[in-house]
Amino acid sequence: MGDKMLSKTCRDENFFKVFKELKHSQSLNLPNNNKLEMYYTKIMNNKFDYTALIELLCENITNYVFSRKENLEASEKRKISNLTIKAIKEFRKIKNEDDNGSGGELGEILLYTFLESRLNAFKLLSKMELKTNSSDYIKGADGIYLYEYEDE
């Protein structure tokens, strides 16, 4: 690809304040150079530190839910806080613990954070950008990402 036409949208400067890599020496025994990276949320006082995770997700909610264009327009008009409120409203409300699909959208924003932060796979489109009703749980792909494979 050479020149980068896209850049990542994820604000990931706090990624390693939230996640710690689990080091290992295991191999996947595949013919190519694939590797397995594992992470866990940092632990503070023998408990997972969810506060830092929530902050990381909140820093990225508008970039995940809305397109680059919508984020740029809101930024130029200094209306990012309005866009943040709108983004939060897009998340599906959990009705009860048996609610099908509850919490799935949090998994989607986590996936987005990992893909952009660790793989430099840039978001082209998220499923959230296509939603027309916040109570709907849309099944299927969580998003479309562009990953440039570099042959070693």
Predicted regions and their residues:
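Acidic-basic catalytic patches of nuclease active cores, encompassing PD-(D/E)XK
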Residues: 96-128
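Short secondary-structure junctions and interdomain/linker hinges
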Residues: 64-71, 94, 98, 122
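Generic hydrophobic, aliphatic-rich segments that mediate packing or membrane embedding
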Residues: 53, 83, 107-111, 139
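A short, surface-exposed helix-loop junction/capping segment
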Residues: 79-100
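Catalytic centers of nucleases
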Residues: 124-152
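A structured, charge-rich N-terminal accessory region that forms the first stable segment of a protein
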Residues: 2-86
